[in-house]
Every structure is written in C-alpha cells, then in structure tokens.
C-alpha cells in the first residue's frame, strides 16, 4: 500500500535508489500489542492464552486455607461491559461465528468489509456479524466515560475488571481424615477498574496522559563471564523471579556456590543437597569413568573413549596377531576407531600407564571388608600392587587432569568436610540464614522452595530458551514450559563453567542484545499485578482461617481486591517507567512511546552504569538507534527503537532481512487470502511464482491477496549469518553485481564474495530511529550533531501555520499518521458536511446477499479545538477534505498540530544566507528578518490551565462569586454574574480570573468596626478574598472555562449556559445522524421503486385527493416526498410480491435506529445535567484556560534538523536584511563558522536542494543513507536556473552595496524550540523567603531572586563597592531587621541603612548549640587587660 496516496499532500520527488517493498510497521505497535496481550480483553475465557492477566491469576490461585478445609479457585475474568448501544445484545459471543469448514469458533469484525479467516483450518468465511434488531448496532465495549470526558474531569480512563471465583468447602472425616466436597459456590467478584490504553498507545490517569516506557533489562538465563582481575570464570543462573545462583572457583581449584549474593560455600555441598549424596555419585556425574579388570596379576582396560590420548606400554594386537597400536605409540581418534573395528574389547596396561588416575568408588577387600582405597584417591603404583595382592578383580578410575571438567570437582570433594545430604542442607541454611537455628525440616523446606517451587521461582520461558541455546545449542532442547530448575540443569551449568577453563565454550557479552530483552507495558503491569495478588493472597488466607462458618461464606466475603488495585495505581502514578507524556509535538509523542530505558526497578541506576552499558554495540544495528539518546547523565541508558524493529514474544528486539540465495535476493510474499490458487494462508512464496499463479487464474476466478515478506532475526540468530548492506548494487533481476561486498558477520565488518552472502538489509533506514530518519542528508552529518538534531526536533513547538519541509525524507507521512495527530477515516464513504469543529462521513455499506446492509448512517468526527497539551502547547485540528469528496478507509480527514496535509511539519522553510552580519550572529547567534514576526511565521499558541476549587470548610462553605470584599469594580469588569471570567477576555498578570470568598474566623471587633458593621450590614466582614489571580508572565486570551459542580448542588448561570451549549451540540449531532438515516432510507426506497409505472391512480386515504395519476413513472424525487403507507398501496406494473415486506423492513430499520440514537442522546443529556463526581469536600471546581500568542522574539531558541542550534540575537527590519540580486531579502542570516568545526554539512546540502525545490515548486524526499547525490543537487539547481555552486551575490540592505564574496543562499527548514524567552524571563522585587535561612528563594517557579555568588562578590570587592556589597549581603539577603528598616526609610523618604544581625549567623549559633556547645552572645565588648596583650 502506498501511504503517499492516503494523505492530501502532493507526492514528493524521491531520490532513493533502493525501493523498500516492506512497509514500516505501525510505529506505536510496541505499546498496543503488548497491552493487548496482557489484557486479552476481547477474547472469550476459553480462547485466552496463558499469558498476561490469565497467567497471573493461574499462578496465584487456587488459594487454600491453613487447615485445608476450603479452596478458592480462579474460573475466568472479564473486562468492561460488552453490549450494543441500546444494551439489548450482551456479551462477546455475539462477535463470534462458526467456521463452515472445521466448525471452530471464529471472531467476526463489524468494521471489516471482506471475509474473515479461520485460524484453525485457514478457510475464509463470510463476516457475519450479529446486529441488534432494535438499534441495528453490533456489540462493542461500552464505557461510563470516554477519553475526552476523563481528561476534562481528571479521571482515569478504565474499564471494570470482574473475576469469577469458585469457593469449594470440604468436610473432613474425623477418623479417616478423608476430605469430601461439602459445598461449591461460584460468584463474580468486582476487582476494580483497570486502566485501558487509548488508540494512541497512552493511558489517561487522573486526567493526564501518561506513557509507560519499555524497559531494557538483563534477560533471564545462564551466563558465563571472565573475572578480569583473577582470570578465572564465573557462571550465573538468573531467573525471572527467584534466587540467583553463582558458581565460581579460585586459584586453588575449589568450586564455590553463592546464592543471592550471600556467603559462598563449597560446590560439593550444593551438589549433595541436590541429591548426589555420595562422592561416587558426584564423580560419576562429572567425569568420564573407565573400568579396569585384574586377571593373572595383569591389568586390563575395558576399551572406551578414555583410551584416546594415552601412550600404552604394551602393544595392542588382534586375535590373529596383527599389531593395531605399537608399543609406546599414542592412541589417536583414528586408531581408536580401528580398535573398535577390530572388535578388541580389552587392552593390557602397565601400572605406570595409569599415572594421574583416581578411583571413582571405595575399593573394598571382599574377604576382610577393609576399604583398600577411598573414592577420589589417587591410584599410585604402591596402591596398585596392594590391589593385585588383595585379589581385587575390578575397579573404576577417572583422570581429573585429562578430563574436560578438570581437577576442580575432585579437589572440592577432598576439601569438603560435609559428607551427607542432610548435613549439606543444614550447612546451606546456616549460610543463607545466619543466626537462625536450623532444623532439617526448615533447611529442606528453604532449599526446595528456592529453586523447585513454581510459586517462588520462575525461570520463565525466556530463561529456559536462553538456557537451552547456551548449553545445548538449540532452543527446544528441554520444554520451554519447564519453569523451575532441576539437578540436571545445575550439573550442565557447572560442567560448562569448568570446560571454559580448558577453552571449550565461550563467555557471554552482557551488552549483546541477545542477552538483553525488553519488558513492555504488558509485562511490567503483569509483575505489578502479581505483587498485588500475592498481598491479597495473604489477606485471604488469614480471613479463611478466622472465618467461623465457611459453609455460609461467599467468595466476595473473602476476596478484598484493594491491594491489587493499590499496586496498579501505585505503578501508574509513581513508577519510574510511568511518565508524563512528552506532548510538545507529534514526533515527541511517538518517540516517547518507542523509548527504551535501562533505568527503573530491576534495571540499572545512573550512578552505577559504566561506559560499556551505554556504548553502541554491533547488535544495535537495525534494533536500537545508535544516534538518538539524551545528552547528559542518561546518555546511552535511554535509547529509541529503530524504524523497522519489532519486539518478539520473548521480548527480544528483531530486525528484518531479505533472503539471498546463490547471490540473488529472493523477493518473497506472504499469502493473506489464497483466493482460487493452490496456496494456503500464511504460505511464503516467491513473488514471481505468485504473479504466475494469479495470471493463470484469468479474470473470472478470485486472485490471491498477498503482502511483501521478510525474515525477522533476533541478535543471536543474526550472528550465525553473513548479512550484506541494503545499498549493495543489484541488477534488474535482483542479483548482486559486485563480486566482493561489504557484509556483517557476528558483529564484524568483512568483505565477502557474493555467493557467501545469506541475507541483505531491508532498507538503509532500518539502522536509525524515527526522529533520526526525519533528518535529510543524515549521512553527511557528524554523529554528535545528528544526536542533537534528532533530540531538538522533539522540542519543536507547533506553529500557527504548519509548513511541510521542501526537503524531507519520505518519513513525514508515516510519522504523522501513526502519531495519532491527524484524523483518519474509519470506513470508506463520502464527506457529507465539514466545518471547523466536525466532519461527517456518510458511510456506504456493501449489502450482503439477500440482506440489507447494516453499515449505513454516518461517522461523525469531532475535531479537537484549541486543547492544551501536557507541555502547554496547543492541539488544534483543521479539516482538509471538502463536501462530496470520496474518502477511502485510512485517508487523512483533518490535520493536527505540526502536520500539513497529512505530513509532519515541525517548522517553516525559510530563506537563509550563511554570512557574518556585523557581529550579530557571533557564536551561533541568529539574525532574523522582521518579516518572520510580521507574517507570523514562527508564532505559536500556548495554553495554560488554572484551576480553583470551592470547598466545605469548618467555618462554612467557600463561594465562587462576583461579590468580593475590598475589590474595585474595574477589577471585576470581565467577570460574569457567577464570578467567572468571560470567554474572549484579554488578561494580564494580577487580573482576577475567578472570584472566590472564604469564611474567616470571628475576631474581637473594635467599637469603630462594630459601628461600620451595624451601618453597612454583616456580610463584608466575615469573608476574605481567595480569588484566582492571573500569575506573572501570563498574558493572553481566555479560550475556555469548565465548571464542575457536585451532584445535588444548585448550578450557577454560567454552568447552565455551558451545559446548554453542550446539549445543543449533542442535539445537532443527533439531527445530522437522523438526516443521514432518512436520506439513506429514501435512497433505498428509490432503488426499489425507481422507474416503475403506476397501473391506477393513487388517492389519499383520508381526503381521497388524487396524489398520482395512472401511468406515472416513479422517480427518486417523487418517492422521497411520499409516505411509506402510500407507497405500499400503489398498484405497479410487474410488482414484486416481496416489495411491501422490503418497504416495511427499510422503514422499520430506519425508525428503530432513529429511536436508539434519540435514547442515547437523552442519556448523554441526563448525564450532563446530573452533576459531577468531585473529590470529597469539593463543592465546585472551575478550570480556566488562557491562550497566549508567542511571537518570535530576541532570546528564543531556534534550530535546524542537523543540530545547528542558536538563539535569536536581533530582529532586523526587512529592508535592512541582505538581499538577492532580484531584490528578495533573506529571512535568516546564519554564521558560516558554525559548519566546519561541527561537521554537519547536511545543512549546506539541504540549503542548496531547498533553493532548487522552491524555484521548481516541488517537494523532495531524500531518505537517510540513500538520498540525493551532489550531482543530483547540481542537476536540480541547473533545472531551476540557479548557480550550481549554490552561491550568489548578495547586497547589503543598509548601504545597497554588493558584498565582496558570493554567499551560500537557500531554503532551510528551521524549527522554533520550546525554550522560549517569555517562559524564562523573570524579575523579582519582593517575594518569598526561605523559612530557616531567611534568604530569598531561587527560580522562576518560586518567584525567587538571582543568586549573587562568591565570584560576583569578588568582582564588587575589586571595585571597592562597599555599600552595594553590604546591602547585597545583608538587607537584600537574610537580615530580617534590616529589610524592615529599609522599608520604613523608603516610606519616610530617608536614605539611611541600619543593618541588623544576618539570620545565617543565628542559624550558625543554633547549629553549634545542637552540638552541645553553649554559645552566648555578649552585649558589650569585654575589657581586655593589658597583661593579656603583653602575653600576646
């Protein structure tokens, strides 16, 4: 699907040479997919997989009480109320039908036009949706408050979670203790409201939009690393949940185990606890054992693989006397095979051949019962002679030195004093719980629970898969659902660790993306939910044990879901990964949702993260953007997903590649609908074969539908293959042209012949993130500047008039669509009406066979008008379609902030000259033409929200009113009779926005006040002014007021007026929907009766007046005017017998739909009139929105897309700006010295190409790493009649003279960033002081002062400005007495300064007193005796 055609923007001239057939996956799919898998909200209980919520419930339930007489079991859960508009159809089963082929249940989709696929058998079925016979609507999720209402009312956008729980009560036989079921009760328990994700991948929590950032953490599994200082190796088994185990050895070759980073103990203790009780069992588990026999005082070795590598003292001969291995010759692998071939079973060995051998088991003299040699003891020649003498016939040996595992296990067993399993368990308990007296039961319980209890230990499917890949080299070696460990797992781990000493195997790179995985929203929430459920489980168990009579208990008596909901609330409200959405512009929203953070619970911390974790790793290629990351302490810890990357079911990031076979790129497609071809759904077929199959069908049969296919590989899968870059030259048949190509192999760049290449990149874009892919000529910019460029695009403020860039990258359309900023059409149809606030699309439904189409009526799109974003920027949508236009599904109907005809537009195209101008653009400063200010190029609207609430106080209720004591009428001129400012009023700092009075406590009145009170009445005195005033720095227009009143409170006039306008809007929507339905009715009747002739006159039933005469031909206009009862009475030529039925059906369906629409509108109106749910104690809440127009001004920060940022130093009159030979003045002058040292040459190329684009009247797309070449830029400049150098003569606007050198001129896309001088400028006269130090507070938010620091004091000291210094350091700082005196002096007109004691001196005294030093201040100086001076 070509996305370009779905916006209204003109198509761009594309410079890319590599055409990518794979569309970019939906950019916010990461969030949506993860949360869908977690909730499984639209699935029936029997359709749900064991993931997300389902798996959490299954893992915590069933819950049994301590006595074992009752169980609580989880049955299923449901989220939200699924019903039609009128509530007649209830339940998700109405969105299901049965497959005609296999009889399985399949999901139907009311918004899908075509057939639907059965996932069991791959057959396509008719999409038969059950519609309600009253309202004509299918079942859908019905919510109490929609997203907009939640944002306005400060509520959470959520749906109710109901869980069906079964309580089983048993009775125990007192004698046999047998349990029998006494009672079973099942009940649906309301758990609470679970937040829902909006269509844009965000959550609305307490009225604000939040994003849950995905976390990048260490994957569970088994890891081996080298300890650099000591040079030995370390093995770790890291579970998803549970205890960590570490295995290590020291330079004495002793194996140690450490559990949960506690004290270490011998590895043999751990192995005994696992069930390898004796030394022999441990040795057999790790070493290769060979069997020896003694016959006729000679030693024979039973032939096995242990012989390889040995030199034998005796030659080996066959029965026929042929020598296979000569005396003293080493037995190689090939010689060993010959031994086997010759079927030699035993070979003679001399005692010295067994040097270094140890015995596996105790060797016992059968006659005396004496142990001749202990297990794990070395077999010396002396011992050998003893064994021969004692008549021992056989024993088993192993060679620790020669074995892959080495001497570690044997050495550890010798060192270890613990010899039995019970001792081992108690020893482990002592190490883990020092101080607790161990008993065998508690020790066994602790050890068993640590690794073998699924409730306490979860290795997870991911952990098991990583374990299999590492130790067995294939992901399915053991079952992935085996989520606890067993002794074999530990043995395999220890064996691998010990083999590493011999150089067998490889250590792991912890920063490899095969060892780091992404925890997205769903998984993070699943963990929170589990924490809550475990807390709830404890409470339930306690309740069950104290409940008197379980037979009368119901599940809801035992289940209290508060801890679960508290855990979820805490996660959304205060988790480090739940963040206030960055909503500056659509790009910042998308980037925030695609962000990956290594911080957060269970992750790293800024302080501990080293350089390696932050660095770019070869596996980031195509998965994580190497460019986009914040500057500062979080660099490298917070990153962004690449354009094409996706996250697989295990949480690993995958990147797409196309297959290469024998040097040719395979163009594959995936079958979506086989039609009449022989393929099945999901088959991967070569494009040529598919085209051929479709061609063979001819025009009559249904052709197959397909989409481009590529293979997604994870980081460790990718390491196995050789992968070429996307820009490898291919011929027209897709064959690689050069014999040697650049390729990647296991993270290294290599040159490979084309036959060895196995995959090729999908697109050059796949390396970078969305923000970086929007930078044209990214390949010509230094990486540091590209980083700044991609970060600064996210700070661009939405401008009053958006303007798409002349030089884009082709990603603008995709980004704008997926961000949710633009309005997309849900169903194909025709635009019925358009105004600034809404768009109505008349839906054209396709009728099914013999059925009337249900898909009639209209889609009404309410546009967002001047809404405040999280960052106080303005969200405003403007329609870009016209009435009568046909719009396909997915077309852009309206532009949002920062979009222009469906394309992302963060800034404006401006004419730029690179030249110095009188020092005003020194050091990155920017010189701007006044034209940009006059023509509102960079004017933006910012909306501030202020709220005030009237509460119930102890002294009486607060009141929102116009009647404020001691306030002049001029201050109240803009307030209405309710005390709330009118919309459209212009306000400045200090103006009253909402008048409010608060009752104040009774005070003792003076006689004069009593007299005044008696004359002027009681009211004025007992209330004080608590109005909402406009704060400093805010100057603008009131654009909206929202008033929320508590239920049952009398509404004021303003509330009623607002309510009335909302009701009118609802009724207007209703009228439009009814109009469309009646039009549709007339249209359908028209198609039924159009062109039919009357056989007789038609008279009115009541008046008998002739309505139509005989032989009249019916037209649509006539039919529309007539009533249905008259239509039914007409006698028509060749009238269809079912005609009257069809007329009835159309009429009935229309009237039913109208009735339901009216009912829904009435409900909405009733909800409006009912009053609002407010926090306790709040009577009324008023929100006032002020829109401020921010024009471009000196001090604003501007930037290009290449990291070229600067601050406006001067706004110059248009006539003074340098101008082109044709008299056009330039709009911005930048300093050319900002380019060479920064190495962001991309901006110069953009300047040239932008100039050509403006002159040719086209827009260009130059995708990253595949953009316009220098030759192409020159070609376009020539076509536009511009100099190919990109330079031209410029003239000084002030003098009219020509500048000496030609100057680079062209169009650059410049952004205004959200660092506006109006938000930063700040001044203080008198303001708040810190309570303890009595020094002024700092910062604009606190209305603070400017710090006069140590160095500034030195400067004044250098000038000897003593009085200024004294005033700064005392009266203007913390001399409380002094500042009061200065105020007095100013009032009296005196100029004296009387200093007091600075408060910091008092603070110092208090500090010393707190250290128990008795410091007293003397009033008078003490007389110093002469003797003391003499002594000095």
Curated annotation (Swiss-Prot):
Q: Which residues form the signal peptide?
A: none
Source organism, top-level taxon: Bacteria
What molecular function does GO assign, one term? DNA-directed RNA polymerase activity
Which Gene Ontology CC terms are recorded?
DNA-directed RNA polymerase complex
Membrane spanning stretches? none
Its BP terms in the Gene Ontology are:
DNA-templated transcription
Broad class of enzyme this protein falls into: transferase
UniProt lists the family membership as follows: Belongs to the RNA polymerase beta chain family.
NCBIfam families in alphabetical order = PRK00405.1 (NF001616), rpoB (TIGR02013)
- What's the stated role of this polypeptide? DNA-dependent RNA polymerase catalyzes the transcription of DNA into RNA using the four ribonucleoside triphosphates as substrates.
- Subunit composition? The RNAP catalytic core consists of 2 alpha, 1 beta, 1 beta' and 1 omega subunit. When a sigma factor is associated with the core the holoenzyme is formed, which can initiate transcription.
Return the protein name. DNA-directed RNA polymerase subunit beta
Q: Origin organism of this chain?
A: Solibacter usitatus (strain Ellin6076)
Q: Which gene encodes it?
A: rpoB
């Amino acid at each position: 699907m070509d996305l370009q055609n779905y916006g209204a923007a003109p198509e761009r001239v594309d410079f890319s040479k590599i055409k990518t057939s794979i569309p970019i996956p939906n950019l916010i799919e990461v969030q949506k997919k993860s949360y869908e898998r977690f909730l499984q909200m639209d699935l029936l209980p029997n359709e749900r997989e064991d993931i997300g919520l389902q798996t959490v419930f299954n893992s915590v339930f069933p819950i049994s009480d301590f006595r074992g007489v009752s169980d609580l079991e989880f049955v299923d859960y449901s989220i939200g109320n699924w019903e039609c508009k009128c509530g007649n159809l209830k339940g998700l089963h109405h969105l299901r039908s049965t497959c005609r082929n296999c009889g399985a249940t399949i999901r139907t989709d009311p918004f899908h036009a075509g057939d639907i696929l059965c996932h069991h058998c791959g057959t396509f079925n008719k999409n038969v949706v059950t519609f309600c016979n009253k309202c004509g609507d299918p079942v859908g999720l019905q919510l109490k408050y929609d997203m907009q209402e939640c944002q306005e009312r400060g509520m959470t956008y959520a749906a109710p979670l109901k869980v069906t729980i079964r309580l089983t009560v048993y009775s125990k036989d007192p004698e046999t203790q047998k349990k029998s079921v006494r009672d079973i009760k099942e009940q649906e328990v309301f758990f609470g409201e679970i937040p829902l994700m909006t269509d844009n991948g965000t959550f609305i929590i307490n009225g604000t939009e939040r994003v849950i950032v995905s976390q990048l953490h260490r994957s569970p599994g088994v890891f081996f690393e080298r300890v650099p200082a000591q040079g030995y190796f370390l093995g770790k088994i890291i579970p998803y949940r549970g205890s960590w185990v570490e295995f290590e050895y020291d330079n004495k070759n002793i194996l140690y185990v450490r559990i949960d980073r506690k004290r270490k103990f011998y590895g043999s203790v751990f192995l005994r606890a696992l069930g390898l009780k004796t030394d022999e069992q441990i040795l057999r588990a790790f070493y290769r054992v060979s069997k020896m026999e003694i016959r006729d005082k000679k030693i024979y070795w039973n032939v096995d693989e242990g012989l390889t590598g040995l030199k034998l003292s005796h030659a080996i001969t066959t029965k026929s006397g042929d020598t296979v291995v000569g005396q003293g010759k080493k037995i190689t692998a090939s010689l060993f095979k010959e031994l086997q071939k010759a079927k030699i079973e035993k070979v003679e060995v001399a005692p010295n051949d067994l040097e270094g051998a140890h015995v596996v088991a105790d060797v016992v003299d059968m006659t005396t019962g004496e142990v001749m040699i202990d297990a794990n003891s070395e077999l010396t020649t002396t011992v050998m002679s003893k064994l021969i003498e004692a008549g021992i016939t056989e024993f088993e040996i192993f060679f620790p030195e020669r074995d892959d595992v080495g001497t570690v296990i044997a050495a550890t067993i010798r060192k270890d004093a613990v010899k039995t399993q019970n001792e081992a368990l108690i020893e482990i308990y002592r190490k883990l719980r020092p101080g607790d007296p161990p008993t065998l039961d508690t020790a066994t319980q602790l050890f068993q629970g640590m690794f073998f209890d699924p409730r306490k230990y979860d290795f997870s499917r991911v952990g098991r898969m990583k374990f299999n890949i590492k130790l067995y080299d294939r992901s399915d070696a053991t079952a992935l659902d085996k989520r606890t460990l067993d002794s074999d797992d530990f043995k395999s781990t220890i064996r691998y660790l010990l083999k590493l000493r011999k150089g067998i195997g490889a250590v792991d790179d912890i920063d490899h993306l095969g060892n780091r995985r992404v925890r997205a929203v769903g998984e993070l929430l699943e963990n929170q939910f589990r924490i809550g459920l475990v807390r709830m489980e404890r409470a339930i168990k306690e309740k069950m044990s104290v409940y008197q009579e379980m037979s009368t208990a119901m599940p809801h008596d035992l289940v209290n879901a508060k801890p679960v909901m508290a855990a979820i609330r805490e996660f959304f409200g205060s988790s480090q990964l739940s963040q206030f959405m960055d909503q500056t512009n659509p790009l910042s929203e998308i980037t925030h949702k695609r962000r990956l953070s290594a911080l957060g619970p269970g992750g790293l911390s800024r302080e501990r993260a080293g350089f390696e974790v932050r660095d770019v790793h070869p596996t980031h290629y195509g998965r994580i953007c190497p460019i986009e990351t914040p500057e500062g302490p979080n660099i490298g810890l917070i990153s962004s997903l690449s354009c094409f990357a996706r996250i697989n079911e295990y949480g690993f990031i995958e990147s797409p590649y196309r297959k290469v076979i024998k040097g040719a790129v395979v163009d594959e497609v995936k079958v979506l609908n086989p039609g009449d071809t022989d393929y099945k759904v999901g088959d991967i077929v070569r494009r040529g074969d598919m085209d051929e199959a479709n061609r063979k069908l001819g025009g009559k049969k249904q052709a197959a539908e397909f989409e481009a296919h590529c293979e997604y590989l994870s980081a460790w899968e990718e390491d196995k293959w050789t992968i070429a870059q996307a820009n490898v030259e291919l011929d027209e048949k897709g064959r690689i042209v050069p014999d040697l190509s650049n390729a990647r192999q296991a993270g290294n760049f290599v040159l490979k012949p084309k036959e060895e290449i196995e995959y090729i990149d999908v697109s050059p874009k796949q390396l970078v993130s969305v923000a970086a892919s929007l930078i044209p000529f990214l390949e010509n910019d230094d990486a540091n500047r590209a980083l700044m460029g991609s970060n600064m695009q996210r700070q661009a403020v939405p401008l009053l008039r958006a303007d798409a860039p002349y030089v884009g990258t082709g990603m603008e359309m995709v980004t704008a669509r997926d961000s949710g900023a633009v309005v997309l059409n849900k169903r194909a149809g025709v635009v019925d009406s358009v105004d600034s606030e809404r768009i109505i699309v008349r839906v054209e439904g396709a009728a099914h066979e013999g059925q009337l189409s249900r898909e009639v009526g209209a889609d009404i799109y309410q546009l967002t008008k001047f809404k405040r974003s999280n960052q106080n920027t303005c969200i405003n949508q403007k329609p870009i379609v016209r009435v009568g236009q046909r719009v396909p599904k997915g077309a852009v109907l309206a532009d949002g902030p920062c979009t222009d005809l469906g394309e992302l537009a963060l800034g404006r195209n401006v004419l730029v000259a690179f030249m110095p101008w009188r020092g005003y653009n020194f050091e990155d400063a920017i010189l701007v033409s006044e034209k940009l200010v006059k023509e509102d190029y960079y004017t933006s609207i910012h909306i501030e929200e202020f709220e005030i609430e009237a509460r119930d106080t102890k002294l009486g209720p607060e009141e929102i009113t116009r009647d404020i004591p001691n306030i002049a009428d001029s201050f109240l001129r803009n307030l209405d009779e309710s005390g709330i400012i009118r919309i459209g009023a212009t306000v400045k700092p200090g103006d009253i926005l909402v008048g409010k009075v608060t009752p104040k406590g009774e005070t003792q009145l003076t006689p004069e006040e009593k007299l005044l009170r008696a004359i002027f009445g009681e009211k004025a005195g007992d209330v004080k002014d608590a109005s909402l005033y406009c704060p400093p720095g805010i100057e603008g227009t009131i654009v909206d007021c929202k008033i929320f009143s508590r239920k049952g409170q009398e509404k004021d006039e303003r509330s009623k007026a607002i309510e009335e306008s909302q009701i009118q809007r609802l009724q207007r929507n209703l009228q439009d929907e009814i109009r469309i339905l009646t039009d549709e009715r007339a249209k359908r009747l028209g198609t039924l009766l159009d062109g039919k002739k009357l056989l007789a006159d038609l008279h009115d039933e009541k008046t008998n007046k002739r309505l139509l005469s005989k032989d009249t031909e019916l037209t649509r206009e006539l039919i529309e005017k007539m009533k249905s009862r008259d239509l039914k009475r007409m006698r028509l030529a060749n009238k269809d017998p079912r005609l009257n039925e069809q007329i009835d059906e159309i009429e009935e369906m229309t009237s039913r739909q109208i009735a339901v629409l009216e009912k829904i509108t009435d409900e909405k109106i009733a909800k409006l009139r009912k009053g609002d749910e407010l926090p306790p104690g709040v009577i009324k809440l008023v929100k006032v929105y002020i829109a401020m127009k921010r024009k471009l001004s000196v001090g604003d920060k501007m930037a290009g897309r290449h990291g070229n940022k600067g601050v406006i130093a001067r706004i110059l009159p248009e006539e003074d700006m340098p101008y082109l030979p044709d008299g056009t003045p330039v709009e911005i002058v930048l300093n050319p010295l900002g380019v060479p040292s920064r190495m962001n040459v991309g901006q110069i190329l953009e300047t040239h190409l932008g100039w050509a684009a403006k002159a040719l009247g086209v827009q260009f797309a130059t995708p990253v790493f595949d953009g316009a070449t220098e030759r192409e830029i020159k070609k376009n400049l020539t076509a536009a009649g511009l100099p190919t150098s990109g330079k031209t003569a410029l003239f000084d606007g002030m003098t009219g003279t020509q500048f000496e050198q030609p100057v680079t001129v062209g169009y650059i896309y410049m952004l205004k960033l959200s660092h506006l001088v109006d938000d930063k400028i700040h001044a203080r006269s008198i303001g708040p002081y810190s309570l303890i130090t009595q020094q002024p507070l700092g910062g604009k938010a606190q209305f603070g002062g400017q710090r006069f620091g140590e160095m500034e004091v030195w400067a004044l000291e250098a000038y000897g400005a003593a009085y200024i210094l004294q005033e700064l350091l005392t009266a203007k700082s913390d001399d409380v007495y002094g500042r009061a005196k200065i105020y007095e002096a100013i009032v009296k007109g005196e100029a004296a300064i009387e200093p007091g004691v600075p408060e910091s001196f008092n603070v110092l005294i208090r500090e010393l007193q707190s250290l128990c030093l008795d410091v007293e201040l003397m009033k008078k100086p003490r007389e110093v005796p002469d003797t003391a001076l003499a002594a000095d």
